[in-house]
């Protein structure tokens, strides 16, 4: 996808805004450029799930997958940099189901929200998943993340299940999309 194509993607109420020096880079999850993503995600999860999820559990979740899970040839980790700083990012890895990839850690910095950056990352992940031969995306998000739920619903993802805390199922919203 070219810069011009990325900046022209829109929905009825959201235009993707990019600065002239924005650039997408592929790195490993342990690259220092990725640190702000994980720090801000941990803060976000701690804020949204205070009293529901222990902070130690959040820290474990941030380290749950080995570096190789989000690396070629079966995955990738992309950051959107502005002025050399990560302002958005996301990853994908091979899922247990053949032909399926799982998207993880799709994020936009809280100082750069409502600019369509998460949508840009989502699109970039989809394009690269297709290049690697994946035909289906699976992803999950938490019940206290309405922005993520809306992002997936407005980008053609089908809701498979939705459960909140206190139900007899693990909490989370599960989605899929056939590429």
Which sequence ranges carry the predicted segments?
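N-terminal acidic, proline/glycine-rich, low-complexity intrinsically disordered segments
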Residues: 1-8
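C-terminal "cap" of GNAT-fold acetyltransferases
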Residues: 3, 29-30, 135-138, 142-179
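Acetyl-CoA-dependent GNAT
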Residues: 17-104, 109-110, 122-124, 128, ...
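Active-site acidic-Proline motif in GNAT/NAT acetyltransferases
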Residues: 109-111, 115, 143
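Short coil/turn segments at alpha/beta junctions that flank glycine-rich nucleotide-binding fingerprints
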Residues: 115, 131-135
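Conserved amphipathic alpha-helical interaction elements at protein-protein interfaces in regulatory
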Residues: 127-131, 158
């Amino acid at each position: 996808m070219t810069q011009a194509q990325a900046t022209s993607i829109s929905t009825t109420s959201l235009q993707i805004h990019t600065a002239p020096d924005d650039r997408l880079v592929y790195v490993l999850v342990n690259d220092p450029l990725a640190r702000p993503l994980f720090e801000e995600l941990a803060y976000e999860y701690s804020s949204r799930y205070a009293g529901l999820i222990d902070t130690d559990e959040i820290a474990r979740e941030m380290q749950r997958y080995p570096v190789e899970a989000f690396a070629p040839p079966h995955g990738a980790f992309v950051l959107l940099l502005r002025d050399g700083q990560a302002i958005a990012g996301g990853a994908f890895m091979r899922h247990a189901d053949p032909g399926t990839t799982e998207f993880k850690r799709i994020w936009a910095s809280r100082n750069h929200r409502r600019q369509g950056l998460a949508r840009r990352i989502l699109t970039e992940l989809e394009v690269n998943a297709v290049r690697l031969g994946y035909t289906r995306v699976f992803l999950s998000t938490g019940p206290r993340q309405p922005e993520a739920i809306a992002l997936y619903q407005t980008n053609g993802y089908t809701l498979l299940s939705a459960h909140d805390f206190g139900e007899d199922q693990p909490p989370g919203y599960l989605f899929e999309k056939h590429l």
